[in-house]
């Protein structure tokens, strides 16, 4: 074979190799560096005066209802659906309502389900989602400060003559910063209605302070012991919310993993469920103290 032939063959082989290389896909890009892990967003912190304004609409709730409201507010995303369900079933009470909750297999947190007998409270929370989320965030991040704010507002209402024992609840003063509001009958809870602009300010001359707080009908909670109503209280001096004698300990840090301290037992026997799914106008359940 001549030298010319060999050179020509080499050139052809080189051209073929270059063509193959040109048609080959480019190598994949290098993997990106591992994402940097950032700490969770810091908890929003409120000043005492802001906390006073935040809790004023619920500060005079009796302790058991206040405890359920504060813990339920930390699940603010569940409140609208719970309020809608409670409104649709507001014709049920006691064991009938408890049975409906079980039969509908509701997936709310127990603290939210504990408020289902109180459609007016849930409606107030659902109608003001910004307030509810702010309250829940404060409870998660600043529970001691939230409880102190409640005590400051209760002290104001006492000083101005609005908060005192009556037929619905007993006001018990255990010491500074320890004002308890307890139902007269533990099986029934009365929701107080009041205007914060009135009860937390000095009364006007000639104003009858006894008209500053009114009450709706008593709500029977005996059928809702599984949802914490059998034993819920505050340790005001230790800044604890106690459910079934165990501290409720959900915080801003563990809010994604915390499990309620009690489990819901099997449904208690009761009568047949009444079906009458009639949605009532939401305005019927607006708390009076929310209308300023």
For each predicted feature, which ranges?
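Mature extracellular/secreted ectodomains of secretory-pathway proteins
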Residues: 70, 74-178
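Low-complexity, repeat-rich tail regions
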Residues: 25-30, 145-149, 155-292
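Bacterial N-terminal signal peptides
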Residues: 9-19
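Mature N-terminal segment immediately following signal peptide/propeptide cleavage
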Residues: 43-66
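Bacterial N-terminal signal peptides that target proteins for export
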Residues: 1-11
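Compositionally biased, proline/threonine/alanine/serine-rich low-complexity intrinsically disordered stretches
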Residues: 22-46
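Short hydrophobic alpha-helical segments that form membrane-spanning helices or hydrophobic packing faces
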Residues: 66-72, 191
């Amino acid at each position: 074979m001549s030298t010319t032939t060999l050179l020509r063959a080499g050139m052809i082989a080189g051209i073929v190799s270059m063509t193959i290389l040109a048609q080959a896909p480019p190598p994949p890009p290098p993997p990106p560096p591992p994402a940097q892990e950032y700490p969770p967003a810091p908890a929003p912190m409120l000043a005492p005066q802001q906390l006073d304004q935040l809790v004023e609409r619920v500060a005079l709730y009796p302790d058991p209802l206040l405890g359920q409201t504060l813990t339920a507010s930390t699940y603010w995303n569940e409140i609208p659906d719970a309020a809608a369900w409670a409104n649709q079933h507001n014709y049920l009470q006691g064991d009938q309502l408890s049975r409906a909750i079980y039969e509908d297999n509701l997936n709310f947190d127990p603290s939210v389900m504990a408020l289902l007998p109180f459609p007016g409270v849930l409606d107030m929370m659902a109608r003001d989602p910004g307030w509810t989320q702010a309250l829940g965030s404060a409870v998660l991040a600043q529970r001691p400060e939230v409880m102190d704010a409640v005590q400051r507002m209760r002290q104001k209402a006492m000083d101005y003559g609005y908060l005192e024992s009556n037929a619905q609840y007993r006001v018990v003063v255990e010491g500074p910063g320890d004002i308890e509001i307890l139902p007269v009958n533990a099986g029934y809870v009365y929701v107080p209605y009041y205007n914060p602009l009135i009860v937390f300010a000095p009364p006007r001359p000639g104003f009858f302070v006894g008209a500053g707080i009114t009450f709706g009908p008593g709500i029977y909670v005996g059928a809702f012991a599984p949802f914490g109503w059998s034993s819920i209280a505050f340790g005001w001096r230790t800044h604890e919310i106690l459910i079934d004698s165990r501290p409720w300990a959900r915080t801003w840090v563990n809010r994604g993993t915390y499990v309620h301290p009690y489990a819901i037992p099997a449904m208690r026997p009761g009568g047949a469920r009444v079906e009458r799914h009639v949605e009532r106008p939401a305005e019927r359940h607006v708390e009076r103290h929310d209308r300023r």
